Amino acid sequence: MNKTLYTSKFSLGKWCFLFIGGIILFTIAYAFATIPELYIGNNWISGTLSLICGVLLLLMYRWLVRSYEERKIEELSMQKSLKDTGIGFLWGMLMMAAVIGIFALCGWYKIIGCSFNVAFVYRYLMAYFVVAVGEEIVFRGIMFRLLDSQFNLWVALIISAIVFGAAHIINPNATVVSTVGISLATGVLFGLLFKYYRT
């Protein structure tokens, strides 16, 4: 059994099955996982169902890799995940604080009111958990990783970044500039981070 993040090259048929089938499977599952946030009014119920859906997506990915790639799932190692998640949260908060700070200095961001609702925060924290899990499985866990293992890093970065950006063109108020920005800043960056940290 190959115990690395990347398996040796598959046969073309098996690679196509994992690549196309995996993307289709998790895109559909991800769509269903967003239902609680979109259609359930109660914040606590919606948040809890979103959390359950996110965990199920992770279990599905574990099943896919174990069943068809027959390797240790290094990218979902709990020992690495807890530490890396904490570091990721810290960097994420620092970057968001920097962006908001720049916006405020430029006069583009103003606080006109302040309130705090624990249930509301819980709901959307869990909703974004589903978004993060779903997108990372599809674009990094499957698309980027399989392209990188079968071809090379540049092919994986370019294709996954373009598709990642294109998937966000349907966002409210999205523009060509914002889509290109997501492709370059997020698609490429997250691909490189996945390659470096292997998680």
Predicted features and spans:
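Small-polar-interrupted transmembrane alpha-helices in polytopic inner-membrane proteins
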Residues: 97, 132, 152-169, 183-187
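Membrane-interface helix/loop boundary segments of multi-pass membrane proteins
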Residues: 134-159, 192-199
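N-terminal, membrane-interfacial amphipathic/helix-forming hydrophobic leader that caps
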Residues: 1-72
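Aromatic-anchored segments of alpha-helical transmembrane domains
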Residues: 23-31, 96-102, 161-170
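Juxtamembrane helix-loop-helix connectors linking adjacent transmembrane helices
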Residues: 35-48, 70-138, 144-149
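Functionally important transmembrane alpha-helices
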Residues: 179-199
